[in-house]
Regions:
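A general structural motif
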Residues: 1, 32, 65-67, 94, ...
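A solvent-exposed beta-alpha-beta segment
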Residues: 1-71
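Generic structural signal for conserved hydrophobic packing positions in ordered secondary structure
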Residues: 8, 70, 97, 144-145, ...
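Glycine-rich hexapeptide-repeat left-handed beta-helix
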Residues: 9, 151, 156-222
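Cofactor-binding loop segments of dinucleotide-utilizing enzymes, especially the Rossmann-like FAD-
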Residues: 9, 37-38, 75, 102, ...
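Short amphipathic alpha-helical segments
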Residues: 17-19, 83-86, 131, 202-203, ...
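Phosphate-bearing ligand-interacting subdomains
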Residues: 42-101, 106
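Left-handed beta-helix
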Residues: 77-85, 89-147, 153, 159-165, ...
């Protein structure tokens, strides 16, 4: 049995914690230990799960336990690159990150999923899909066949990604967003909720709408 610590404590970190706990009850091959989180205003627990340590010393505290692995969930749409740099500063070996797939998901045998990626309830990952390390795919999302996602991509719930697409790294995709087939999304792009992306997007672009178009306003922190 693997035991999991989530680095983070707000938003998606809590969602993933609850889904790991759900899998723990239904399947029993995983145990959620608690959070590594720095905000002391939360006290000693979040939603009944303990805060075990700070983010920066999580690996130091638990590296001696070979069955303890980590999931990183400190992503923010306005600070994606900074948060990826923060993750890398912890110097946690990639094989100590846990790949979580909720038992309700359908994942093709030919799909390849990297370390530290979390795939939430009722997602479908179609054949020959490649998903990189430390990605997050929230509930009821679909990744089309022959699509490749780089590292650190975040998809909010109800995302639909068409087939034969390529995503770089560090992209943030809002709720209920749809992507056409045969398009390329660069690195560190932001796609606003309910967007319909019908064309490729260059790196570092912010888009939203139907069809999705570029915008320049600052992204509000979540």
């Amino acid at each position: 049995m693997d035991r999991v610590i989530i680095i983070g404590g707000k938003g998606s970190a809590i969602v993933i914690a609850e889904q790991i706990y759900d899998a723990q009850i239904k399947v029993g091959n995983i145990e959620f230990l608690g959070f590594a989180f720095d905000d002391e205003s939360f006290g000693k627990e979040i939603n009944g799960f303990p805060i075990l340590c700070k983010t920066y010393n999580a690996y130091e505290e638990y590296s001696k336990y070979n069955d303890v692995k980590f999931i990183f969930q400190l992503y923010r749409p306005d600070l994606i690159k900074e948060r990826i740099n923060l993750l890398n500063s912890y110097r946690i070996p990639i094989n100590r990150f846990y790949t979580f797939i909720h038992p309700s998901c359908v994942v093709a045998r030919s799909a390849k999923i990297g370390f530290g990626t979390a795939i939430m309830a009722n997602c479908v990952i179609n054949p020959n899909t490649i998903i990189g390390n430390c990605c997050t795919i929230h509930s009821n999302s679909l990744i089309g066949h022959d699509t490749e996602l780089g590292d650190y991509n975040f998809f909010a719930a109800h995302s639909v990604v068409g087939s034969n697409n390529t995503f770089g790294e560090g992209n943030f995709v809002g709720l209920n967003t749809t992507f056409n087939n045969y398009i390329t999304i660069g690195d560190y792009c932001f796609v606003g909720m309910a967007s319909n992306v019908i064309r490729s997007i260059d790196s570092f672009k912010k888009v939203y709408g139907n069809p999705a178009k570029e915008f320049t306003k600052e992204i509000k922190p979540l």
